[in-house]
Amino acid sequence: MVNHKNVKKMIKAIAKRTLINKMRKSKTRTAIRKLVDIIKSGNKENVTPAFRSAESNLHKCVSKGVIHKNTAARKISRLNAKVKALMTA
């Protein structure tokens, strides 16, 4: 058991931050999944807003320190390539 007040506070703060980070990651994964589903269906009208949403969520995760910037850049690049392939097809 912890003996210091600040340790108890930090445990609560870490648990809260972990929950928020999980929510952000989940929201981002959902946006990416929706974009991939739209790409697979071949719907060209809805692909741009879905891509913007996924890209925005990834950038927010980077700015909040949830994921690394290179990871986000790689995912955005791969999603963008899929979107371009759909638009040119």
Curated annotation (Swiss-Prot):
It comes from the Bacteria. InterPro entries: Ribosomal_bS20, Ribosomal_bS20_sf. Pfam families: Ribosomal_S20p. One of its GO terms (cellular component) is small ribosomal subunit. Signal peptide: none annotated. GO terms for biological process: translation. Coiled coil: none annotated. GO terms for molecular function: small ribosomal subunit rRNA binding; structural constituent of ribosome. Keywords: Ribonucleoprotein, Ribosomal protein, RNA-binding, rRNA-binding. Binds directly to 16S ribosomal RNA. Belongs to the bacterial ribosomal protein bS20 family. This is Small ribosomal subunit protein bS20.
